[in-house]
């Protein structure tokens, strides 16, 4: 078992979600530097290294794997996830372990959040992906009565749809997986269809105008190109899914220019984002538990990854211990 450094803690993992980026690390060509698995863990504090911000053994917590320095140019501009410290901090050995150490810096910078009594470990394992979604929404100028297109009906894609619904925004969702299309529809998407019907649905939902924002919640280059075509004049395309390393997209730059379509991306989440996400879950504003379809023990992690990889009949897969 790892030891708690001074100011840090060791946590016994009780639940950890499998993310699409975990699958990309195992099976694909991940485009970010860290190759550690499991960045959505929650658990119980096992040991504390001296003064650790008031944390005590036995506390139920969510733990964020990355934290920013809070003082660099990126942090000053609200770009915490681009901070050099952010990518250098992590859990050890990783979140997908019986026990993992949380560095003192993570504790000091708000990377460990005590859980309200009524929030389960499984719900807490959904804090990080929801936080990532909320951060992406902060960069979108969408309000009540608008329409977003969500390309990709995986767990975060459906979270985007749920956020839209909570704000009075229509969500047209697409996916190549019929199971996930049906899942999105059941969880409140305004429309959920296969990609070949996506553009027509968006036009129908907006009177031909196009989506105010398109969230590409998949790493598919084809989906990115499709998304640009679905955006209205002056709309925004948000790259949210992780494209494999070396991905290229062919776009008509003249069309982007003439229609004033913006393309941007959103990576990960800050400590402030995780606090907001936990607050939404605790307040019942986003029912993340409905996304969990499969649970596996840590010893069954290989089977869990295969289930999550297939996706034909699975949404969120969570490792419990």
What label would you give each PLM region?
Residues 2-16, 29-73, 81, 113-116:
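Glycine-rich beta-strand-centered segment in the early N-terminal region that forms part
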Residues 46, 172, 238:
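Conserved beta-strand positions in the Rossmann-like core of class I SAM-dependent methyltransferases
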Residues 231-233:
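Helix-to-beta-strand junctions that scaffold the AdoMet/dcAdoMet cofactor pocket
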Residues 69-151:
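NAD(P)H dinucleotide-binding glycine-rich loop of Rossmann-like/cofactor-binding domains
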Residues 157-158:
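N-terminal Rossmann-fold NAD(P) dinucleotide-binding loop
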Residues 225-229, 271-321:
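C-terminal hydrophobic helical "lid"/dimerization subdomain
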Residues 147-150, 163-226:
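Adenosine-nucleotide cofactor-binding segment
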Residues 242-260:
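Rossmann-fold NAD(P)-binding glycine/threonine-rich loop
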């Amino acid at each position: 078992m790892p030891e708690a450094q001074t100011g840090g803690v060791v946590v016994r993992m009780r639940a950890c979600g499998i993310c699409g980026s975990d699958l990309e690390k195992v099976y694909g060509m991940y485009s970010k530097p860290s190759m550690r698995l499991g960045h959505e863990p929650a658990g119980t504090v096992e040991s504390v290294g001296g003064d650790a911000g008031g944390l005590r053994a036995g506390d139920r917590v969510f733990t964020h794997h990355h934290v920013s320095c809070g003082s660099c140019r990126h942090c000053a501009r609200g770009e915490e996830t681009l901070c050099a410290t952010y990518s250098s901090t992590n859990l050890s050995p990783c979140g997908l372990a019986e026990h993992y150490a949380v560095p003192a810096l993570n504790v000091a910078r708000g990377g460990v959040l005590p859980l309200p009594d009524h929030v389960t470990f499984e719900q807490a394992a959904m804090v990080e992906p929801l936080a990532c979604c909320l951060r992406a929404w902060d960069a979108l100028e969408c309000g009540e009565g608008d329409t977003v297109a969500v390309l990709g009906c995986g767990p975060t894609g459906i979270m985007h749809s749920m956020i839209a619904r909570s704000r009075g925004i229509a969500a047209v969702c697409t996916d190549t997986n019929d199971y996930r299309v049906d899942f999105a529809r059941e969880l409140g998407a305004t429309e959920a269809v296969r990609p070949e019907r996506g553009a027509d649905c968006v036009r129908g939902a907006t009177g031909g105008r196009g989506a105010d924002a398109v969230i590409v919640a998949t790493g598919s280059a084809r989906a990115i190109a499709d998304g640009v075509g679905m955006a209205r004049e002056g709309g925004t395309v948000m790259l949210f899914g992780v494209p494999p390393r070396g991905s290229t997209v062919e776009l008509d730059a003249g069309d982007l220019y003439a229609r004033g379509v913006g393309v941007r991306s959103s990576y990960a989440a800050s400590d402030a984002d995780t606090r907001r996400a936990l607050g939404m879950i605790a307040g019942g504003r986003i029912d993340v538990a409905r996304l969990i379809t499969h649970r596996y023990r840590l010893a069954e992690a290989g089977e869990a990854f295969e289930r999550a990889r297939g996706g034909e009949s699975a949404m969120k897969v969570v490792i419990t211990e």
